[in-house]
Amino acid sequence: MNGLLLTATGGALPGRTVTNDELSQMVDTSDAWIASRTGIRTRHWCTAEESAATLAIAAARQALERSGLSPSDISCCVCATLSAPDATPSVAVGCRRRWVCRRTGPRWISTRPAPAFCTAWPWRGGCWKRWRAVRLVIGCEALSRLMDPADRSTCVLFGDGAGAAIFRLADTPFALTLGARGSDVLHAGGPDRNGSAPITMDGRAVFRFAVETLQVPPRGAGRNAAHPQRSVVGVCHQANSRIIDHCVKALNADPAKFYKNMDRHGNTSAASIPVALNELAERGLLPAGASRWPVSASAAPDMGRRDFSV
């Protein structure tokens, strides 16, 4: 399989910014308590007019505009999310319908119901071989709609947002690691779970899982080049600052190479890596030809890791 070339990014954040001090008025917590344990200071929550779908559409449109491509140039679109506003039509379908050129667009579209942006890339392996053109990958979340605002263990962690990335196949090395723990589950409320928290999480177990998976180097043709010590920057799932710090120390890597933005956005699940990539691109921190080591160790028991170039 060829490597991937990142050609453009886009991002979108909700209009409402929620500070730790604001949360301290809702639950028994404080800015110092949250920041010291997670590194999070603020996060964005959707307003009544916003959703994971509207954010995804905005991020995808921005990526398209920056790439100079038209919707008809996109041969495949995949969206990763666990907080889509509707079971059907999918968020990916909604993105296609809202593009400027509505009668043309991806020949194949899907929404992956998972909180890991990185696992959405290899999931499309058959598409890469069938349509050797341009792919759009989106990660979007509106986790504020799934949280119990009275549950301190979750409401302080999660935020909303969306990021989009456009990739091409390229003759560059690649490295890939995928994994899942089918015996572990993240419980989310449904119609038959009245009175239960929409999202519940064993924070200590998630921490252990994230630390374990983040320390495993990618496997593939570019394994050596993909190691974090040899990459220009590592883009990890932005769940908790302490998780990244712990892994950087264990890997004996340079902390300056690992990008963090959870202090401003919290844990946006599937959106965290594409939002981070978009910020790096906007700041001019993705020089052409650089190797990237994006890692997703999500709150749910699946993970993916992919090395690519820009």
Residue ranges with predicted function:
Residues A59-S75, V216-V232, L280-L285:
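Phosphate/pyrophosphate-binding loops at sites that engage ATP/ADP/AMP, CoA/4′-phosphopantetheine
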Residues M1-A48, D151-R208, E212, V216, ...:
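Condensing-enzyme catalytic core mediating Claisen C-C bond formation in acyl metabolism
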Residues E22-S24, T29, T54, S83-V93, ...:
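A structural motif shared across PLP-dependent enzymes of the aminotransferase-like
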Residues L6-A8, I34, A63, C77, ...:
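Buried hydrophobic positions in well-ordered alpha/beta secondary-structure cores of metabolic enzymes
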Residues T7, A80, T111, R135-E141, ...:
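Short beta-strand segments
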Residues G125, K129-G159:
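Flexible, glycine-rich active-site loops centered on histidine and acidic residues
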Residues I40-T42, D73-V78, R97-T111, S144-A150, ...:
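Glycine/charged-rich beta-loop-alpha catalytic/anionic-binding loops adjacent to active sites
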Residues A53, I57-A60, L64, S83-A84, ...:
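Claisen-condensing/thiolase-fold acyl-transfer catalytic domains that form or cleave C-C bonds
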